[in-house]
Amino acid sequence: MKTAVFLNIHADTYARFAHIRTQLLQGNKESQANALGNVLSEMACEVIEQVFIVLLQQNQQHSQTGESEKVIQQILEAIRKYMPWSISFFGNDRLIPLVEYLSKTLYLEDERIYMTYPVKQQLAEQIQASSQKLIQGDHAEILKALKLLTEVIDVGVTHLIREPKKCLKFNFVVDKTLNGVINMTTHLGYKRLEKLGSQIDQQLAATYVDYFLKFMRQQA
């Protein structure tokens, strides 16, 4: 058994992705670049919204979450701007490796669609242990728990963004631009999580970590 993160994708978004994949594999000559760029940006935003924004909205009574939500909106805006733009450069044949890579991350279960990525067992056990310490009232565990949470999220960024980006083999200028966007957005998110460590109490930290753990489960 392996541990993986399961992130829900809306059925209509998945249906659009599946349709584009079918068009590409059947050799349809009509360009799929714009449609694919839009659907991938929606997938990315759905993932970010369910992991972060829903959590922050549950804790709106804490003033710190307002600043967090602004950071997340910046990230969503960058995704909606740059992902469709980056995909638009390519003909259909160049899109197939990317679509096939991403299709392998999708998992259907009980009429629900998940985008998944694996997490090393050691990291999974560490964050679960850290969560238990927070639940037991260990205030000193807050910073470590949020750091581990950042590590789990970054594994997802690598598996779902950095690695599939390689499939497209961008030219130097575009690749450098996209790397800058990825680095900027992840830095914003990770710095915000780090800052939260000094602003929230143990109980709220436990809520944050436990919420994310709900996305992690065993995968056969």
Q: In which residue ranges do the predicted regions lie?
A:
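Protein-protein interaction and targeting regions used for scaffolding, dimerization, and localization
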Residues: 2-220
